[in-house]
């Protein structure tokens, strides 16, 4: 399926379905793979589904759905399969063998095909199986198997977290002899949701008989919280509380030499995330962080790049980080252009995809330097610079420490202009060296903030001096004295502050 993205704001989400309801994204494994590619020249996404070692049961109607924001489109197609003529006999029990490696892709269980082959094996006649509705239940009549057995097997069909194949049915015999110890045995298989409880019930012929319960061949010990044994008349009950994935196993009830077996499947709930991954565009060497926040505890999160899973052993450039059970991160410390691509985070029942574009660093031109400022106290100081790329971000630092905006300090980035504004300048706090450092570039633009000092000398206010010059009587302009006699002039002088008296004779000071 090809999707044109030239008119789309975000990458489209494509899902594949078989029939009306089966999401093939939950069936990805060694027999079914989903791939996607992107052509930057034509801006076309190509989504592909690959079926490996196809079986006749894969035949049917398929649907592909593409969703992007408010746009939706879908297309339907049919797949026809031709079964090989050399059928041969099939050992149904060997097909149900559970592997011990515990991996998800250890095998896949195709109940539709197995039930058909089992009918052929037991009755040697062709049969037709019907699968309709949701969930799928397969019905049929057979002299070799009861309808309840078919329902239990079909009940397991579509489990997404199956990590191995059934071991229980391997031990089933073609012709089971009638049990003398059990009136009613365990059903072939049970299913329970994670966190719930389940009861396994058998009926014994002897009401005084003692039974043993085993899990994967090991005796189960009774406990108050996890395993509870009950004996009510002919019934023997094993209750398993708070089921986890560790309880997904084979169980058996033993009376003397007789045993009955069952298989318990613990189904994980579908997980979701509060926010999808976001597309990112960074420069070479700039740190990348993808964040995923899951809705439930215990979710197994898997990261992929272009459809290939990222593991700790294979990805030296990637780092996985968890913050509690809710948040998980994919970190790329020093990305290169090769790290560009589609990144996917997956968990049971949910996935999200984002694009990462890593670009080479361009040459950044400085169109306007940061100028030194000289201001007075309580004035406004504005540092401003302009660079050639409006997408370049950066930080302001003062004396080597990052400037944090507050009520007085404002930082703005408008287009190519970066501005730092300081209101009500305080000499002790704001004076210093300021620099703007653009992200991803090894240089900075610096300036100084200085203050204009105004010196004022304080002169205390003084009263004008007061001088009292009292001359007794009218003073003559000319005084005549007989030569040889002494001249005495009495002039009373007072004042505030005390005046200094200077006598002069002509132009000479006496």
From Swiss-Prot:
SMART domains: IG, IGc2. Signal peptide: none annotated. GO terms for biological process: cell adhesion; sarcomere organization; ventricular cardiac muscle tissue morphogenesis. GO terms for cellular component: M band; myosin filament. GO terms for molecular function: actin binding; myosin heavy chain binding. Heart. Keywords: Actin-binding, Cell adhesion, Immunoglobulin domain, Muscle protein, Repeat, Thick filament. Residues 177-269, 270-347, 378-438 form the Ig-like C2-type domain. Pfam families: I-set, THB. PANTHER family: MYOSIN-BINDING PROTEIN C, CARDIAC-TYPE, TITIN. Thick filament-associated protein located in the crossbridge region of vertebrate striated muscle a bands. In vitro it binds MHC, F-actin and native thin filaments, and modifies the activity of actin-activated myosin ATPase. It may modulate muscle contraction or may play a more structural role. Belongs to the immunoglobulin superfamily. MyBP family. This is Myosin-binding protein C, cardiac-type. The lineage of its organism: Eukaryota, Metazoa, Chordata, Craniata, Vertebrata.
